[in-house]
Amino acid sequence: MAAAFSSTVGAPASTPTNFLGKKLKKQVTSAVNYHGKSSKANRFTVMAAENIDEKRNTDKWKGLAYDISDDQQDITRGKGIVDSLFQAPTGHGTHEAVLSSYEYVSQGLRKYDFDNTMGGFYIAPAFMDKLVVHLSKNFMTLPNIKIPLILGIWGGKGQGKSFQCELVFAKMGINPIMMSAGELESGNAGEPAKLIRQRYREAADMIKKGKMCCLFINDLDAGAGRMGGTTQYTVNNQMVNATLMNIADAPTNVQLPGMYNKRENPRVPIVVTGNDFSTLYAPLIRDGRMEKFYWAPTRDDRIGVCKGIFQTDNVSDESVVKIVDTFPGQSIDFFGALRARVYDDEVRKWVGSTGIENIGKRLVNSRDGPVTFEQPKMTVEKLLEYGHMLVQEQDNVKRVQLADTYMSQAALGDANQDAMKTGSFYGKGAQQGTLPVPEGCTDQNAKNYDPTARSDDGSCLYTF
C-alpha cells in the first residue's frame, strides 16, 4: 500500500500522476470532522493511491454474477464428472464441440504420418490416393470446375472397401456420418429420402463447427439397385435415387421436407460403396455427379493387408506371403476368417473344462468377467490346414445346390446322396461312440473298399 499526503489551503489538492505511478488508482477522500459535519473547502484533504495487483482480480465466485463460461471447453472439462447419461460419446456425432480454427488440445496436437498405414494396418496407396483427393477437392474452391460430390467405390465382395475407407477416415481425422443399405427402404414412403437429407445436414452441421466430415453409405446398390427381375422397385428406391441426384446437383442447398430455408449449408462429400453399380439408376452414376473407382487389390495390396491381420500373432512376413499365394482367388476377408478359425481349438478346450450345462452362466451376466484365452500359436501349417477347410466349405456350397434340386423335382429319399458320392457319409464320427461299429475302408474309389464297413479306419489303399 502506497500513499501520498499533501495539505493545501484555499486551493484543491493536486498530486502529479507520475508520482503515483501508472498502476496506481487515485482515490480522493474528503475528511469528516469529529462532529459528523461535512468538510468545507479549506479543510485538510487526504489523497491515497492503492497499488492494484492483477492477481486480486481473479475472483473464483465471479461466475455467479457474470457469465464467464466457455461452452466449448466446458464439454471437455465435464468428461468424467457429469453423469454419462448426459454426455455424448467423445468423437461421435454433432455433440463433439469443436473450436472454429483448431481442435482441442487432446486432438489439436495430434500428428499424422504421411504413410499408408494407420494403427498398424495397411492402406492401399491407390485407394488412399483416390479417397483423399476426392475429399480434399470437395472442400476446396476451385475456379470454374464442377467437382463430383459422390465417390462410388465398387468391386468384389470381401475386398476391404469399407475397412479401407474407415482407415483413411481415421487417418484424416474424419468422423463420417454412417448409413447402410438397410436404411434405404421403409414401410413409409419417403422416409429413406428424408433420412438421407437429415444425415447430410447433420454432417454439414459438423463442418460448420469446424470439423471435417462426410456422409458414408455402405452397399448402396443393395438398397437402391435392382437385383434381377425378382426385385421389386419401390417408390422409396426412386426417391433415394432422386434425392442423391438432387443433392449432387445442389450440395449447398439441401432442405428437409416441409420447410425451406434459403440459408446455405456447407458442402458435404458423399462416399458410397457397392458391388455392382450397373444396378443403379444410370443418371445417378453419370460422371458429373459420381466419380467411380473400381477397387481390385493387387498381390502387394493383399500381402500388405494380411500383414496387418496377423501382426499380433508373430507370423513372419515370409509365412504371410506363402499363405496369400496359396489362396490367390480368395477375398481379403477370407484371411480374417482364417485367423478366427484358429481360436476354435481354444474355445473347444474351454467348453470341455467348463461343461456344456454351465456355458450360459459363465458367458452371460457373469461375475467373473469376460473369458480370456492365451494367444494360440499360429504356424504356417495350421493356417494352411484351416484355409483348405474353409475352401472345402466354399466348394460344398457351390457344388451342392439343393435349391435347384428341390425346385426341379420331388427329391425324396435323397437327403444323403451327395455325402455318399463323396465318401464322407460314414466318416469317423461313429468311432466316438461306445457301440461296436464295423470299421474298414469306406471310400468307394479305394482298392480295398469294404461295403460292410460303417466307420472309416484310415486303411484305404489307392492306385496312382
Swiss-Prot record:
Domain of life: Eukaryota
InterPro entries recorded: ATPase_AAA_core, P-loop_NTPase, RCA-like, RuBisCO_activase_AAA_helical
One Pfam family linked to the record: AAA
Keywords carried by this UniProt record: ATP-binding, Chloroplast, Nucleotide-binding, Plastid, Transit peptide
Effect of residue 66 to T: In strain: cv. Glen
GO molecular function: ATP binding; ATP hydrolysis activity; ribulose-1,5-bisphosphate carboxylase/oxygenase activator activity
Gene Ontology CC terms: chloroplast stroma; thylakoid
Chain positions recorded as ATP binding sites: 155-162
SUPFAM superfamilies the UniProt entry points to: P-loop containing nucleoside triphosphate hydrolases
Transit peptide range per the UniProt entry: 1-48
Protein's cellular compartments: Plastid, Chloroplast stroma
Family affiliation: Belongs to the RuBisCO activase family.
Function description: Activation of RuBisCO (ribulose-1,5-bisphosphate carboxylase/oxygenase; EC 4.1.1.39) involves the ATP-dependent carboxylation of the epsilon-amino group of lysine leading to a carbamate structure.
Entry protein name: Ribulose bisphosphate carboxylase/oxygenase activase A, chloroplastic
Organism of provenance: Hordeum vulgare
